[in-house]
From Swiss-Prot:
Protein's GO biological process: cellular response to corticotropin-releasing hormone stimulus
Name used for this protein in its record: Probable nuclear hormone receptor HR38
Localisation: Nucleus
SMART domains recorded: HOLI, ZnF_C4
Amino acid sequence: GSSSPGVAPADNTGPRAAPSSPSQLCAVCGDTAACQHYGVRTCEGCKGFFKRTVQKGSKYVCLAEKSCPVDKRRRNRCQFCWFQKCLAVGMVKEVVRTDSLKGRRGRLPSKPKCPQESPPSPPISLITALVRAHVDTSPDFANLDYSQYREPSPLEPPMSDLEVIQQFYSLLTTSIDMIKLFAEKVPGYGDLCPEDREQLFASARLELFVLRLAYRTALEDTKLTFSNGSVLDKRQCQRSFGDWLHAVLDFSNTSYSMDIDISTFACLCALTLITDRHGLKEPHRVEQVQMKIIGCLRGHMPGGGGSSSGAAPLQRVLGALPELRSLSVKASQRIFYLKLEDLVPAPPLIENMFRASLPF
């Protein structure tokens, strides 16, 4: 498979030809590995990830069953399983130089400062809080609901227009309820004035619906997984979503090719919510929260921390935000059309979307 741009530069280096023996492959992901790092033959990508994880004391969360595939192409998709694989093949944490040892080629500091005293654990980091907010409002992939799933079949009578729209409204409202919960868990959101919270949420809810749905949709998969755990065949959604579905799937392919990890994705969701919107009462306070999240994302991304090498991946991730806005407009138009058709009374949440003024 082709390597993902901007995520692990080490993937693009090294000879094109297959290594002559398995001993030249990375024990973690199978990529080309020139030599040993931290006790095991590993590639530069896995070495760098292991080192960063240990030095920063990062804690990861698996969204699935802690058995995600870890190979050259997919290792970035679950950092929890990637790190566990590093440990499983024998990479040694104790060999990684911490900040106090940097530049000393692994020699111990001349006077260790009370080695038996461990420093107090820092308060929960912003990035951890954002990942937790995302995980807590995402479906449990071990317990998905296939009760409404149907593959198109000539033997199966199609659903009526009425049923299709009812199903669509139900999926949309439960998803938006989950997005509301996500918003409330984003650090800093609750400190904003009530009017600005409402404005930010109303502006971002359809963008977040698209973003989260796209992230859960694998490239070659024929299924869509919604926030409440319901799984549908993509073709089941064609009638209710209309042309909007194609735009969502195109965006899904784009975001899949970026191959962003869960921490980056959680930051992207937060930045979709916490951003400058028309009519904010205290835009400066919103900007303060936004800058904290951007700083957090910059520090997390490979080559981040203000170095020029981190600019390209960061800009590419942030470049998804304007596209989300146009997809949100398409969504509003589609929902407005279904509401005008009036086959099914729109639930209050949908009705209220258009109460003040048309959002497109």
